[in-house]
A protein has these predicted regions:
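A short secondary-structure junction motif
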Residues: 1-9
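Short alpha-helical scaffold segments that flank and stabilize functional sites
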Residues: 12-15, 51
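Catalytic cores of nucleotide-enabled group-transfer and carboxylate-activating enzymes in metabolic
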Residues: 9, 16, 43-44, 78
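Acidic, PIN/NYN-like endoribonuclease modules and their adjacent C-terminal/linker elements
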Residues: 61-133
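Active-site neighborhoods of divalent-metal-dependent phosphate/nucleic-acid chemistry enzymes
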Residues: 20-55, 105-116, 120-133
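Short, mixed-charge aromatic SLiMs
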Residues: 16-20, 72-74
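Residues at structural and domain junctions
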Residues: 2, 30, 34, 84-87
């Protein structure tokens, strides 16, 4: 990452923590009973299981196999599909929240078209839906 990208990411994390202070759980969790193909992801499964999450939203199908998640009653959801589902449930309210975010990103990167931004974020289906509105 470039220094600018790192700074943007750090600012985004700070903003997220300001907006959702309860989202980060420092609770110690014993990772030993949990297994995933990538040991670096086990802490995510452990926290989700211990806190009775219904789902883990991730693009990473390979390292979060549904068969393993089923053991804990957790579903893996693709972020693109999740945004489409949220759109079905909350339509204009969701779009009203996303428009300023997209405008900010586009002002920082005016050379990139909106659909390309959605594609780079691995959200192509939702991006097409958003672009049609």
């Amino acid at each position: 990452k470039t220094p600018l990208q790192r700074l943007e990411a750090e600012n985004a994390v700070r903003q997220f923590l300001d907006d959702f202070p309860e989202a980060i759980r420092p609770d110690p969790v014993d990772l030993r009973p949990f297994w995933l193909p990538d040991p670096g992801d086990v802490h995510i499964l452990a926290l989700a299981a211990v806190h009775h999450a219904d789902a883990i939203i991730t693009h990473n199908k390979k390292d979060f196999p549904q068969a393993e998640l089923n053991t804990y009653g957790i579903t893996r959801i693709d972020p693109d599909a999740q945004l489409l589902q949220l759109y079905k449930l909350h339509g204009t309210a969701l779009m009203d929240q996303l428009r300023p975010v997209l405008a900010e990103v586009q002002s920082a990167h005016p050379q990139i078209q909106a659909l390309e931004l959605w594609r780079k974020a691995w959200l192509p289906q939702f991006g097409r839906k958003f672009d049609r509105l």
